Swiss-Prot record:
DNA binds at R71, E159, G232, D234. It holds the Pfam family XPG_I. This is Flap endonuclease 1-B. The gene is FEN1B. Binds 2 magnesium ions per subunit. They probably participate in the reaction catalyzed by the enzyme. May bind an additional third magnesium ion after substrate binding.
Length: 412
């Protein structure tokens, strides 16, 4: 869900914080991608007709694999260096929201059964989508696919969008791509919406910079976090009757939630009992993420592994898999493999237009250096992780408590 009404609020009160861009403007850039919503979208959209979905011979759904393959190929062909970040354990405060979603799915399942009984195809289509749930297997399938494609994968210890924001804050990536606006609340320096659109054509990419958001709203980061909590987020109830517009006015007037609560009309508004806004504030400011992160590395696709996984195990057309591999290789040859480079913003991006008539100052980073050949077996170490590399694979030897896991293609 993210932050209720934040997109509309920023469009009205911070229009200069959003910049329309082309996908090509991010050529050569390293972008962290929040995968959680993407996989859900694939399961809903790709190959679905009513209750019928794409499956392999074992009856297992493969829509997520088809969607992830196609989208990743298009991202690579655009010259973008993606790093896919997966959700870890949700914070305790989010479990109530997840329980609500589960109950809603259960209700949709009952509605779906009734729609099937009466043969209402429109309702079948509607309710079948509402019953979709992303499972651990869906996530593991996508991690395996991405690793075979030679693309870095990060398993976050907590929320993926929080980990993406940490990667951006620590200059491991140029920007993060997600549809959840709470990426800004977690402090993402540069946040992209619509970058991972299935077609790349439906909407231009919208780029937000948190510094410009704060400047135009006239708030500090702490006040912006309180604004988001008041507006409504995934981690606690908000005060009924207070939406984004009212929340912004109150924060500008009183500064922080404590002062807002003290000055609220007790007859008009009812503050939730034991409202954990302080814990939610701490979660946004200090989420469960890792900051000691090795450099990312992109490698050639494992053609044999992809054919075995997609064609042999999941009944994809072998010819289609080979064509996808050829596209990945062509993109890698064109933009080069290796480590991504991030350059400081110093010049305009070609073809970019600001919604406020101003253009941000940035330049495109050059492609990463071509990866040197590895020895057949190489042990790499960091302060927290050990990896063994055997050309294209890496196996973790150990990790500290609470540390994230990085896939095969994270170079140290």
């Amino acid at each position: 869900m993210g932050i209720k009404g934040l997109t509309k609020l920023l469009a009205e009160h911070a229009p200069g914080a959003a910049v329309r861009r082309r996908v090509e403007d991010y050529r050569g850039r390293v972008v962290a991608i929040d995968t959680s919503l993407s996989i859900y979208q694939f399961l809903i959209v790709v190959g679905r007709k009513g209750t019928e979905v794409l499956t392999n011979e074992a009856g297992e759904v493969t829509s997520h694999l088809q969607g992830m393959l196609n989208r990743t190929v298009r991202i690579l062909e655009a010259g973008i260096k993606p790093v896919f970040v997966f959700d870890g354990e949700p914070p305790d405060m989010k479990k109530k929201e997840l329980a609500k979603r589960s109950l809603k799915r259960d209700g949709s399942s009952e509605d779906l059964n009734r729609a099937i009984e009466v043969g209402d195809e429109d309702l079948i289509e509607k309710f079948s989508k509402r019953t979709v749930k992303v499972t651990k297997k869906h996530n593991e399938d996508c991690k395996r696919l991405l690793s075979l494609m030679g693309v870095p994968v990060v398993q976050a210890p907590g929320e993926a969008e929080a980990q993406c924001a940490a990667l951006c804050e620590n200059h491991k990536v140029f920007a993060i791509a997600s549809e959840d606006m709470d990426s800004l609340t977690f402090g993402a320096r540069r946040f992209l919406r619509h970058l991972t659109d299935l077609s790349f054509k439906r909407s231009p990419v919208t780029e937000f910079e948190v510094s410009k958001v704060l400047e135009e709203l006239g708030l500090t980061m702490d006040q912006f976090i309180d604004l988001c909590i008041l507006s409504g987020c995934d981690y606690c109830e908000n005060i009924r009757g207070i939406g984004g517009q009212r929340a912004l006015k109150l924060i500008r007037q009183h500064g922080y939630i404590e002062e807002v609560v003290q000055n609220l009309s007790q007859t008009r508004y009812s503050v939730p009992e034991d409202w954990p806004y302080q814990e939610v504030r701490a979660l946004f400011k200090e989420p469960n993420v890792c900051t000691d992160i090795p450099d990312f590395l992109w490698t050639p696709p494992d053609e044999e592994g992809l054919i075995n996984f997609l064609a042999a195990e999941n009944n994809f057309s072998p010819d289609r898999v080979v064509k996808s591999v050829e596209k990945i290789k062509a993109a890698n040859d064109k933009f080069s493999l290796g480590r991504g480079k991030l350059l400081a913003p110093v010049a305009n991006l070609t073809g970019s237009t600001s919604t406020a008539g101003k253009e941000p100052k940035c330049i495109l980073g050059g492609p990463g250096q071509v990866m040197k050949a590895r020895s057949p077996l190489q042990v790499c170490k960091s302060s927290s992780l050990n990896f063994i590399h055997d050309n294209s694979k890496a196996f973790m030897l150990g990790r500290r408590s609470g540390f994230l896991r990085i896939s095969t293609y994270a170079s140290i």
